[in-house]
Swiss-Prot record:
Location(s), subcellular: Nucleus
Cellular compartments per GO CC: Cul3-RING ubiquitin ligase complex; nucleus
Gene name linked to the record: klhl15
Name under which the protein is recorded: Kelch-like protein 15
Domain named BTB: residues: 31-98
UniProt-listed SUPFAM superfamilies: Kelch motif, POZ domain
Amino acid sequence: MSGDVEVYLSQVHDGSVSSGFRALYEERLLLDVTLLIEEHHFQAHKALLATQSDYFRVMFTADMRERDQDKIHMKGLTAAGFGHVLRFMYYGSLELSMLTVQEILQAAMYVQLTEAVEFCCSFLLAKICLENCAEVMRLLEDFSVGVEGVQEQLDAFLLENFVPLMARPDFLSYLSLEKLMAYLDSDQLSRYPEIELYEAVQAWLRHDRRRWRHTDAVVQNLRFCLMTPANIFEKVKTSEFYRYSRQLRLEVDQALSYFHQVNEQPLAETKSNRIRSVRPQTAVFRGMIGHSMVNSKILLLHRPKVWWELEGPQVPLRPDCLAIVNNFAFLLGGEELGPDGEFHASSKVYRYDPRQNSWLRMADMSVPRSEFAVGVIGKYIYAVAGRTRDETFYSTERYDIVEDKWEFVDPYPVNKYGHEGTVLNGKLYITGGITSSSTSKQVCVFDPGREGSSEHRTRRTPILTNCWENKSKMNYARCFHKMISHNGKLYVFGGVCVILRASFESQGCPSTEVYDPETDEWTILASMPIGRSGHGVAVLDKQIMVLGGLCYNGHYSDSILTFDPEENKWKEDEYPRMPCKLDGLQVCSLHFPEYVLEHVRRCS
């Protein structure tokens, strides 16, 4: 007979052990320990208690005096609470209500019954509301519950309901200075306008006169630059705390200075003007459907993957370039409908502020430009080359954000349009485009540190070469493509490869390339499923999105492609299609206050 061993596993063993203990418990057989709590006697099996509870396992297996006792006194918990916990250890079910959960949680924590503690926490989180929030939070704090994720869910509820909670006396009594400071410091507290947060802080201070001494500290965690001047004058300066707090007066003065210095706002990187937002939104500034201008609404790809619309500047403008400066969006040039009913190159510049969902008209460029490129370096926005209906030029000018003024700088080496520009490591890279002779592979980089004097420069200043430097050419000549910087490299997508001047026909370029500035080398990556031009690009969740454009099957697109740089793969249908098919769109990632998005949602 063979000596091979085969193992058979019972499918009912675990259940039979549990049911066996339950049967012994119900029949009061082999019970070997009595637990005495508040004059109540609970009989049980040591073996079962030790398998269910770390507390009892140590008690009955370690060198403790209770190990050999058959009667054990337990203090610090209630008989009612322990009765539920003991039943849970035998039967695996736990009956919870708001009347009993405190005693049950106390007992479960006492005997270190982790699963019962988790059930109590889940119950409390499911039942939490405005009326019992303070009670629930105090309860969990009193027992120092350390269940993973509980504090995060509590904080999420509080941040979501901060303003209505601060109208409740019980919550005002509960909320400590330390917790208030932490919540006011959070970017997740984005559902409410800042003035409502200020009014909530006033309620907390007024709840207890002894809290007034904390006013200076608390107001430093409010962001007064996110309010409006009317908020400041009507609700802040009229309060008793404005007279009481020197720090509050200082914060107000700084906010009023911020409001007054309109041009400098995009460069003011302070906590007071930073939007309360955790995740950026993908914003699409709309362009054209074919040769027809569309309205100037902004499309927002909001989570969970829903398109919303925001109003844009009320002009018949198709911007060609978009520059982002510290979460302000500048739309520049492009084409606009003239009084003659024809489209003309535009010199107009608009600034969008998502803090207040507001637009400003800024100083026009020195010359109208379409099909040009821009880049932001320091306090300047550079506009490079481009064309009008009648002329292609090489002139380069820069916009001084503080002075709201344009000036010419060293021009691009050749006349060009249809190129693309992106800033990387403080330098402006220009790729591709159309010169007088052909579609280009050329790559030039502009280094402002080597720039000549801008004094007396005009659109026709002779070419200098000290600040423009040629880099390795792309593998493919292209124009009307898109380029974006990501993880220290430049990625180029699509465009037009060849323009046949005799017939004005074009050939699409589905290729993707990446440039490494450290090696000055271009590498070909996976091609797009179908070539396109006039599309938009943005980075979202470590992936690069390609939106809309003119595909080379002859159709305009409303689709979104996503490219994973790490896997070098394209995906389709990761995101919903745009509400309409667009060409010439400008795309970016912007942070919006949640209350602005909530208003958009209600209006959509």
